[in-house]
Amino acid sequence: MIVVGIDHGTSGITSCIMENGLIKSIFKIRRTEFEKLSFLDELKKHINLSEIDLIGVCYSMGDGINKITDISRVKNRGVRNLEGIGKKIGGGTKVYDEIKESKIPAVVIPGLHKGIDCMDKRFNALFSHTASPEKISICYNAYKTFNLENFILSDISSNTVTLLIRNGKIFGGFDACIGAVGILHGPIDLELIKKIDLREITANEAFSKAGAVKITDSYKGVEDTKSEIIEKYEKDEKCKLAVDSLVLSVSMEINSLMFLNPENNVVIAGSVGVCKNPDISKMIKENTNGNFFVLDGESGAIGSAMIANDILYGKKDILGISVDFNIE
């Protein structure tokens, strides 16, 4: 059985090919490469397309569907609209459309929003949106990899999203625009609200550079800013302050959910979260009283493949989210 998992990330589209539950290949296409590349042509370099049994697709915010749904039944790519969600390149749209037009069996994974029934009603009352689809994939990866039923997952990368899983179901959490900062994205504070009101910037522009990058002089675009700041941690005072401040904000976010986390398990993921120099997870652990696990690798794409694989084995529920797909 061969499945493909897709992570629609800020800096690019990552794909994981899995055969009989084992990772066969992982590849990434940077956002800026999509003008000259076809996703399916790249996928053909790794696997015969006719051999694929199912693809697990993550696209944008996923706020237009509330189940893991057969792509043939999804309208408008599973989103309400594409406004206010960060820098738009168009690569994810191209990948989605190529997959749908190919007729390869595929499911679209939703994001976490008010329509997701497994979420605690208080979180849904507080926030219209909690996470994009790949965060569900990352949570499922952690759930399977570490055999955990109760844990906090903090995915730290271009943005930071922190989720709580209780009794094997997604309970709630904080979206990228709410609490902790990522390298690029973060919550909008008073200064940014004033700039928005004065029409100096849009709310989306404010969110897109409200992360740790605002502390530095190191913005290098959506693909290269992370490495620029991390590599300068020991050499540049502003970059060090930016990373240390990110760690503080993530620690605060994790600790704010700990009273709802009965086993004190914490999983750190994301390209920044798994960084070893500086050791981000160790820095966060020093601020937090919990049992720490680090989910290495391309956790979103792998998790999407795990979801597709388990659906083929008859799974009808993924972390509390229903599956709407018929196995032929």
Swiss-Prot record:
Coiled-coil annotated residue ranges, if any: none
SUPFAM superfamilies: Actin-like ATPase domain
Family: Belongs to the UPF0285 family.
Protein name: UPF0285 protein Mevan_1551
